Amino acid sequence: MDRPVLVLDGMSLTCGDVAAAARGAVQVELSADGRQRAGAAAEVAAYATARREVYGRTTGVGANRETAVSSGDAARHGLRLVRSHAGGGGPLIAAELSRGMLVVRVNQIAAGGSGVDPGVLDALIDAVNKGLSVPVPAWGAIGTGDLTALAMTALCLLGERDWVPRPARPPHFALASPDALAFISSNAATIGEAALACSDLRELVRAAITVAALSHLAVRASTEPYAEQVHAARPHPGQQEVAAAMRGLLAGPAGPAPRIQDPYGYRALPQVHGPAVDAARHAGQIVTSELNAAAENPLIDVAGQAVWHNGNFHTAYVGLALDALRAALFQTSALSAARLGTLVEPAFTGLAPFLATDPPPSSGIMILEYVAQSAIADIRRLATPAALGSAVLSRGVEEHAGFSTQSARATTDVVPAYRIVLACELVAAVRALRLRGIRPAGRSLADAFELAAGALPAQTSDRPLDGDVVTAQRLLPELAALLPPEPLPAERLPAEPVSPERPATAAGSPP
């Protein structure tokens, strides 16, 4: 079956695009403009290298930056560089993360600031479209460049390391020595991993609203806390968005609320889940900006015919945004568990403890609270900010690190844990609604209930619930899709690529 085509142009890649390409849902192509920008940058890089010192092209790297590459060694220096930097350690990262790295590096080079020979782009795209991955060890980067991951990629292109799985005709490109550092000096692996996590979490934080609405209906909670007037009084965007979504999902006739005030799991949902919505949106915007940035050091400025040595290799923005997202996810996960606690409590449901239907003291869904809290414990652990660390490296000349790589990895690990938390709440909410004989009045929530009730087993006697939790996890993307479109752009802070058409900002090489 033909797959949809994703065109990489260096300007418009989104987190969802990276996820689709990394997971084989689309075929990747390069735009003509992206190829042209990459080629123009390569020409300027060659021109500049012949006339001035350029870090990594005519010099060593790190603490060796003041050491010039001799003319007699120029053809071998780059190969030694990629070989020596392909030294990561630990287990290999997931294949989809490796392919995400390749997609991001193609788009970065197409943005037109690296100076790398554009011929490498075809080989990288070929690898993605064949479903290949680079064997990238998990440890080797600290948020200032994924040197080990990109060096391993370079060795795969050179034929010194095998692609995974090894194809009959491996993608091949002989990187020229001056292009070695320009190719590996990138955060493509970190940014690619962040993009996949942001894509997944954007979907889950939307699904969480639908799940919460089902729980709300099951305990006959009050809709008063979601009133528009309440949230106009404190107009945080995410808070207002969650409240509006709840008003829409719970629309329809409702009887008098049984309590003057509900527990925080319902009453404070907009105030607690809203920050997660905002944090997911902000992280997506930050990562999207990185996806389309020519964040190269040195930066090849085609318009100015200049080379700029700079600090755009540092990804503090990414790490801090992801750290904030994980903290927000812990808060809303705890609120999901609080709602689960009301669903097993007769005072809120009017049903037997733990929604059991066998003779007392049957356990019903008791174990789901333990499962959810186990996952939340991991979310709490993973919410520790990676940005609290730092490092001094390469004989003291690289004296700071933001550890965005570790932040991206922690955010990846949060995804399945948060998914489990929501799945436990969904299983409980659907069972409570069934047992109470309640059907949602609003179209979207009715669709959500019918979808979940049609997939989850109706049997309520004590039995293993692991299969229910797996099924509930699979339903979450469809529950997210039932919400109206987001009122604000999900992930669009475009970075203007370096291009020949951009007005010149530098007359020549900086001193």
Question: Predicted regions span which residues?
Answer:
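C-terminal auxiliary extensions adjacent to catalytic cores
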Residues: 1-36, 40-49, 74, 135, ...
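Residues that scaffold, gate, or flank divalent-cation-dependent active/transport sites
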Residues: 13-57, 61-99, 105, 117, ...
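FAD-binding core of FAD-dependent oxidoreductases
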Residues: 55-77, 84-107, 135-158, 173-191, ...
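Generic short alpha-helical segment signal, independent of protein family or function
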Residues: 66, 82-89, 102, 106-109, ...
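Short gly/ser-rich anion-binding loops that grip negatively charged ligand groups
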Residues: 67, 87, 91, 110-114, ...
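Short helix-coil transition sites and intra-membrane helix breaks within transmembrane domains
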Residues: 113-114, 147, 333
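FAD-binding glycine-rich core of flavoenzymes that anchor FAD
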Residues: 113-139
